[in-house]
Amino acid sequence: FVRHIHSNLKKRADLFTLRSGRRSLRAMTTSSLSSRGALAANNPLRIDHAAYHEAVANAYHPTENPTGALPLNVAENRLSWSDLRAKIESITTEETIAAWVPGYTSMRGSLEFRRAAAHFLTRHLTRCPVDPEQLAVSAGATSVIEMTSFILADAGDAAAIPAPCYPVYSQDIGSFSGVERYDLVTHHEVSEISDGPALTVSHLEHARTEIEAAGQRFRMLILTTPDNPTGGIYSLDTLSEVADWCITHEVHLVVNELYGLSLIDTRHPEIEADYADDVAFNSFASIMADKQSEYLHLWYALSKDLGISGFRVGLLYSHNAALLEAYENLNLSHTVSNHTQWLLQHLLTDDDFMTSYVAENQRRLTEAYAVVVGALKRLDIPYVPSRGSLFVWIDLSEFMVGDSEQADLALWQELYRTSGVLLTPGVGFGHTKKGLFRVVYPCVSMEELSVAMERLGAFVQAKRQRQGSSTSGDARS
């Protein structure tokens, strides 16, 4: 088990060296650590981590720092925080802290909070009854993913995830559990997924063949809907077909609905032409209820839909009694503060407020999304039409010099150093095409987002002018 963890960390550290061309200076001071610790000390959480903190320290301000940076690379939704903050402040002043808060409760989360969460999920996300006894609560989505992977899979097992996918899945499933990520490639060009994810049973069969040929067990399939980074939504028909395949082959299917309420209004007049079909989000919970299988599970968290990543609340929903029992016995180090659970219990059971909040947040998300895709259309930059999440997946491959990870990172760095706009680099998402980037659009104000799009436009136009001049020069020589 330890050997698999060490191997997984070593692969990540070597990959970081390949991508950045250097190791952290901290490598010289890790002799006091275990081999695992030394590798972790030299292996950043994500490749854009340092750049993000640099950008935040030099953040744009219209008057105080008009040439400052605009970080659009971390998945945070700040558009509706002012509304939520006012509500939370009213709870803390008007409600009396419950007697259960200062003591120990269930390691899967207090029953009071799980009841509130089940009520919220049933009313707003799943649209079918959620049993609080089948919920487990941990300190954030990362903890839920770590715990689930640790319990369901052994070190060296494979978890297939359709590419492109959230890069930090590798750490979430691998750092402690030793589970290895398999990038399930279903397409190359972004145009191939303009109507949504392209996953089929044939893709799963191909993945199983490759995984087993490598001497591994295909143990988990992880789907995110709405997807990160493409914003695509899996239809219920696709989810049902995939679920049947997974049950037959004893592969655990986990559907991550982290962005399930962060939906785009595809009828908005500025974007409606992008959508040929009206594909609505439907929760995987209804399929779980119908099939009642120990191989089907759902992840959720309050981080994105409510914009409270710092509160650290993630949820597992499953009909697998053994999984939930194991979770209870292992979750001590991942539990959520009782005070946080108490506070959010009151928030999630205020039906009028939450209904209004979700609707207004979706309206703001749609307006911000329209700003980004409006700019992309004017610039003739290809992108995947999003139906949900906090992202736009864009194609800047026309500006690539070469077709390597180094060239990918060079373009990302050039955009940031030239314009101050920091996107999420495509390196690490597992797809085959280079030159793709993720734009996080609700992490800044609408004014700041407009400035970022203006700067992106200036960068694109300057690059095209230089490319045109270079082409003309080549023709004359």
What is the predicted role of each segment?
Residues L365-T366, L379-T418, C443:
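Conserved PLP-binding catalytic core of the aspartate aminotransferase-like
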Residues F1-L39, G196-A198, Q465-S477:
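Eukaryotic N-terminal targeting leaders
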Residues L111, H119, P129, K291-Q292, ...:
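PLP-dependent enzyme catalytic core of the Aspartate aminotransferase-like
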Residues T248-H249, L379, S419, K463:
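Helix C-cap/helix->beta junction micro-motif
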Residues A98-T248, G260-D290, E454, G468, ...:
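Conserved core of the PLP fold type I
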Residues I161, D183, V255, L423-P425:
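Hydrophobic residues in well-ordered beta-strands that form the structural core
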Residues S31-G140, T200, L348-D350, A462-K463:
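N-terminal small-domain helix-loop-helix segment of the aminotransferase-like
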